[in-house]
């Protein structure tokens, strides 16, 4: 049987959620122990007979990957085929702007767009100097609050 093209949209250890080419979403698992798919991977999968799950049989080449070293010093892939990276911060607890900087730097290294999303503005963010700095150097800065529904249209 030939497989179907799909994209990994969520991972839960060795279980995944795939979006098939026709838009349907299915649960899947990976064939073998060495294959490691991550969110964003384009894969080939096929339905498993007498089950609702699908089986990922291969992972296509990645355009890029967001990586980090793991505790053993090996490179761990966090996401693949990234076309935009959005760093999310909130006013409380105080944002760790160094982490935001690291994500912006990763986006630059991968040559993909970067943006900063400041969430929970209903907590009273006020004027934020760091956000102004990102905006001043050309990164899109979006502010929103899911609680009071502000800024959500711009986010879409």
Predicted regions and their residues:
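Short, flexible, glycine/charge-rich loop motifs used to bind or transfer phosphoryl groups or to couple energy/partner
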Residues: 33, 74-76, 105, 131-132, ...
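Canonical P-loop GTPase G-domain recognition
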Residues: 113, 120-156
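Amphipathic alpha-helical interface surfaces
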Residues: 96-99, 130
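Short loop/turn elements that form and flank the Walker-type P-loop nucleotide-binding site
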Residues: 79-82, 109-112, 137-138
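Histidine-anchored nucleotide/phosphate-binding helix
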Residues: 98-108
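Residue-level signal for inorganic ion chemistry
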Residues: 40, 107, 119
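N-terminal accessory targeting/assembly segments
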Residues: 1-97
């Amino acid at each position: 049987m030939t497989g179907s093209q799909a994209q990994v949209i969520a991972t839960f250890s060795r279980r995944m959620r795939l979006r098939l080419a026709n838009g349907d979403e299915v649960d899947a698992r990976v064939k073998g122990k060495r294959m490691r798919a991550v969110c964003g991977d384009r894969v080939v999968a096929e339905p498993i007979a007498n089950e609702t799950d699908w089986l990922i049989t291969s992972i296509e080449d990645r355009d890029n990957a967001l990586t980090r070293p793991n505790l053993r010093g090996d490179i761990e892939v966090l996401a693949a085929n990234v076309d935009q990276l959005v760093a999310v911060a909130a006013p409380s607890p105080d944002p760790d702007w160094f982490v935001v900087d690291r994500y912006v730097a990763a986006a630059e290294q991968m040559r993909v767009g970067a943006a900063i999303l400041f969430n929970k503005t209903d907590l009273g963010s006020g004027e934020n100097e760091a956000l102004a700095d990102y905006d001043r150097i050309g990164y899109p800065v979006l502010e929103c609050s899911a609680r009071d529904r502000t800024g959500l249209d711009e986010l879409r």
